[in-house]
Amino acid sequence: MIRAILTNAALCLSVFLYSSCQSGDKNSLILENTTGLERAGELIVLKKDWLENKLGKISKEKYVVVADKEGQFATVQYDDLDKDGAWDEIALLQSFKPNEKKSFLLSIADQPATIKAVVRAHARHSRKNADNTFGPDLMMDSIPAAQPATDFTKQAYPPFLTEGPAWENDKTGFRLYFDVRNGKDIWGKTTAKMMLDEVGTDTSRNYHQLADWGMDILKVGTSLGAGALALAVQTNNGKDSLIRLGGVNMGKVYYEKICDGPVRAIIRLRYPEWKVMDGIDAVNVTDEISIWGGQYFYESKVTVNNAPGDSKLVTGIVNLYNHAINKIDTAGSAIAYTWGKQSENKDNLGMAIVAAANDIETISKLPEENKTVTNTYTVTFKPSLKKEVNFRFYAGWEKSDDAFKTASGFKDFLVNQAVLKKEKIIIK
């Protein structure tokens, strides 16, 4: 939606903001980058109770607007995370020079600021209509156990647009196969525009081939693809086994969109009926996926309940071309990554999983004798963390950014990302 800033109001606000921030007024917001690195697209999230400590009580129908010292309003997203009809957090994106400090004014308003907002993050999921068009974007959906994968030899269109939920930002994109495969795939993007409402709606335009916006750049097969999930367990016969979150035993799956653009998008996938093996109760898994503008990753927060006591949560990176798995331990993060000619466009693609170093037990190549998951480098989390795990999955395609054209460029990028992950923007 395009709106115009009211110039006179902005000029008046600019004068007030300058004096307020100079005097340390409670209405001021200070953001500081304490690193010597540039930071692009930093997500700033301010909870409502934190804002009320500064501004006083904020009634349900009111908003908080954010303006810089020139009176220019920031694009702010108001997210109702608990679905009670009132926003709980505001989210905005800011970029910083090395060691830069920024000052803003916070104000309670009757409505959001009237500005031109560029959408930098989006999630969508829609079902196919009888006429082979696709319906509206769904806030909630579910599939039964044993939802089959699409057989494109028998039907031109899948039951869901691009076979399931997709999430993107202005740099990259991802999707989930909403069926028994339950795999995660990568959209390589060459445009900042949101494209995934259009991709896949016309079968004459093959998204496996390079287009002006990009393409599907990953072959997943029976691997863990781009950060799919599995559980390492000891089976009833005492053998260690890796059981993917997929197949008939995955049970019913629930999809919910939590929030959507212009700043960030969050979706939640629930798997409450996963029969990991015979003789135990169903395991309950929730995968909450976030993406925001300016980044080459999605972030996954996984919670697991009722898992066997000795089990370990596992995620992974597809390994179809036998590129080496590289490991870096830096700035409190463990990084597992591959790089090389492994995109479906036959050019360079870097993929990485980044998580807290203290959370990871092993990074390894999956043995070839494993049958339920194949061609995968695995990241196994410590057993003590099976109730909640956080990780980021990165996709660095050379057509998205020249930094990813070389192995050293991708490595340097990941090392810097670990520093930025550790050294948060100071908010006060």
Question: Which role fits each region the language model picked out?
Answer:
Residues 112-246:
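Solvent-exposed N-terminal domain segments of exported/luminal and surface proteins
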Residues 24-146, 150-155, 162:
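Alpha-mannosidase-like glycoside hydrolase catalytic domains involved in N-glycan trimming
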Residues 82-97, 354-428:
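Beta-strand-rich recognition/accessory modules
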Residues 1-30:
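Bacterial Sec-dependent N-terminal signal peptides
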Residues 60-88, 277-280, 321-337, 358-369:
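Solvent-exposed beta-strand/loop surfaces of large extracellular or lumenal domains
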Residues 212-292:
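Extended, loop-rich substrate-binding clefts of extracytoplasmic carbohydrate-active enzymes
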Residues 24-34, 313-365:
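Polysaccharide-binding surfaces and accessory modules of carbohydrate-active proteins
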Residues 285, 289-291, 296-330:
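Acidic (Asp/Glu-rich), glycine- and aromatic
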